[in-house]
């Protein structure tokens, strides 16, 4: 059986920014031990001759072919813009000179 210490549970809780009581710490340690023991069962599985799985579903190239299509005219796209400049949307700067 995998032993999970109180310190390990407290460390994990701290990483997750969780505050847990001593009772919850003990309960969480038991839960984590059960999870780790369950996962350890995979070590005893006979995988001889089984090809590794890279994806849970056997999907290949589910994307469509790229096709160039006519978009909306630039004038129409910019028609309702508050401000434009040189045929592009003009938006307020979000970075000051120090960040740029």
UniProtKB/Swiss-Prot annotation:
Q: Which terms does the UniProt entry file under GO BP?
A: glutaminyl-tRNAGln biosynthesis via transamidation; regulation of translational fidelity; translation
* Stored SUPFAM superfamilies: Glu-tRNAGln amidotransferase C subunit
Q: Which reaction does it catalyse?
A: L-glutamyl-tRNA(Gln) + L-glutamine + ATP + H2O = L-glutaminyl-tRNA(Gln) + L-glutamate + ADP + phosphate + H(+); L-aspartyl-tRNA(Asn) + L-glutamine + ATP + H2O = L-asparaginyl-tRNA(Asn) + L-glutamate + ADP + phosphate + 2 H(+)
Molecular function via GO: asparaginyl-tRNA synthase (glutamine-hydrolyzing) activity; ATP binding; glutaminyl-tRNA synthase (glutamine-hydrolyzing) activity
Establish whether keyword Iron-sulfur is in the entry: no
The EC code for this enzyme is 6.3.5.-
Fetch the InterPro entries from UniProt. Answer: Asp/Glu-ADT_sf_sub_c, GatC
One Pfam match: GatC
| Keyword list, A-Z | ATP-binding, Ligase, Nucleotide-binding, Protein biosynthesis
All disulfide bonds of the chain are none
Q: How is the subunit organization of this protein annotated in UniProt?
A: Heterotrimer of A, B and C subunits.
Q: What does this protein do?
A: Allows the formation of correctly charged Asn-tRNA(Asn) or Gln-tRNA(Gln) through the transamidation of misacylated Asp-tRNA(Asn) or Glu-tRNA(Gln) in organisms which lack either or both of asparaginyl-tRNA or glutaminyl-tRNA synthetases. The reaction takes place in the presence of glutamine and ATP through an activated phospho-Asp-tRNA(Asn) or phospho-Glu-tRNA(Gln).
The entry assigns this protein to a family as follows: Belongs to the GatC family.
Q: What is this protein called?
A: Aspartyl/glutamyl-tRNA(Asn/Gln) amidotransferase subunit C
Gene name for this UniProt entry: gatC
């Amino acid at each position: 059986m995998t032993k999970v210490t109180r310190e390990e549970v407290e460390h994990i809780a701290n990483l997750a920014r969780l505050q847990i009581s001593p009772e919850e710490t003990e309960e969480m340690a038991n839960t984590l031990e059960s999870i780790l023991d369950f996962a350890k069962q995979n070590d005893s599985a006979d995988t001889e001759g089984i090809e590794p799985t890279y994806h849970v579903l056997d999907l290949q190239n589910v994307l469509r072919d790229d096709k160039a299509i006519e978009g909306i005219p630039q004038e129409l796209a910019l028609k309702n813009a508050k401000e434009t400049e040189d045929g592009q949307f003009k938006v307020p700067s979000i970075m000051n000179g120090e960040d740029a």
